[in-house]
Amino acid sequence: MRFLGGRYRLRRKLGEGGMASVWEAHDEVLDRQVAVKLLTPEHTADIDAFERARNEARSGARFAHPNVVAVYDFGTSRRAGRGTAYLVMELVEGQSLDRVMLDGPLDWQVAGRVCAEVGAGLAAAHGHGVVHRDIKPANVVLTASGAKILDFGVAARIGQPDQLPDGTLMGTPAYLAPERLERGTAAPAADVYAVGVLLYQCLTGRLPWPANTDEQMLHAHRSMPPAPLPTIAGLPEEVAEMCTASLSKLPEARPTSVALALLLSAAVDVPVHVPPVLRPMPVKDDALHAATEAISV
């Protein structure tokens, strides 16, 4: 069995793509099971692919939240003279949302809970200055403890340019907020728009527009209003309104990720963890008087 970084023993391959494979591994130092994303040597040698993997590690390591897959470590290992980058993450058991949705729309309460938890995870990211930029069903895994966001590989810091130097936009066309097409700066409102698309898709089994190609999707984001939600038995009006508001063409008209998470969690009666809003503690007159007296002594 392969050993990485002097501590991670690869045990079982969980999946493989063009750029990387994902393994179940054992952390010999902390004696726990982890997941390891292992880049191919070719992609490790590719500057863009390597930077994307490192960006995923750095973005995910900025904060911890129960609805975000935790990042533990990043490093490189050499074998047969070739370097291989690896990312060590929380090992989660569950199904990706895109696979679950192959069976059709979700019950509105399930859809509401999933998107409330995604919103809560994003609220934590936004609170630490991170915009995910690629929220979609394939990047959400459903576990026994709730939904978890995956893959911060194309994440950006709030205020950073929202495109590569050559003008390329990172993300998935079906979930790109209209303002992202103007190639401005990364902002949390774009993630909220993607959650709006996700919620609509969970409720209906389809995208909010009749678009089949990338070009049609980009045109829809810019110019087409979303199709009204169909009648869904039991769906609270405030959930439908939240979905519509999240899909606003104007970023300033969308709710924050915190507001989205809290409204949806209340609608389905499932608590979520959102960052606290810190405010100065009010000082009562008697406390202020006591403090003043203490200073004057």
Predicted features by range, described:
Residues 119-130:
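Protein kinase catalytic-loop region centered on the HRD/HxD motif
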Residues 81-96, 100, 104:
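Conserved short submotifs of the Hanks-type protein kinase catalytic core
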Residues 191:
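Conserved catalytic-loop aspartate of Hanks-type protein kinases
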Residues 11-17, 22:
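Protein kinase glycine-rich loop
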Residues 114-115:
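Activation segment signature within eukaryotic-like protein kinase domains
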Residues 40-62:
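AlphaC helix of the eukaryotic protein kinase fold
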Residues 74-77:
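Activation-segment/catalytic-loop signature of the eukaryotic protein kinase fold
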